[in-house]
Amino acid sequence: ITGLSTRRRIEKGIGHIPEEYMIGVVPDFSVADNLVLDKYFEEPFAHRWGLDHKAVERFAREMIPQYNIRTPSKDTPAIHLSGGNLQKLILAREISHHPRLLIANLPTHGLDVGAAEFIQNQLLALKLEKCAILLISEDLDEIMSVSDRIAVLYEGRITGMVPAADAVKDRLGAWMAGVKL
């Protein structure tokens, strides 16, 4: 997938939540424009002369409350949002494509408890919709609550793999430190 353009990845049903939320947005663009960054070529947003701004506005009005994005306005530049609200914005944009695979790299890292819980609940809901989720996380509680199967990497190698139902924190921690059990 590394050789594919962003547009081709979307067309193939792949979504991505980056490790750093500022990488996932254009800081000076509005919340509304960031929600449709990857939809400019799709109906109803594509317009003969650019974006259909009314369609963008309708979409933003729907997504902002649905994903609990706390913003003064849809026109607020993304740079003025908290990390948790930026992450919810990115999640809303990525989920709106109904991906078959979502790569979530540290999706709750550095977020407050409320925002982290919201993100985890959205991932669980997405999982129920039969979306495969590749969760990359250092939070054992998050890993154990969201995952069906857990693989631990250490220095680029899998040191252990276990169904989440059989996972034990001590064993996972040992694998994370490179200990082979």
PLM region descriptions:
Residues 1-181:
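Glycine-rich phosphate-binding loops of nucleotide-dependent enzymes
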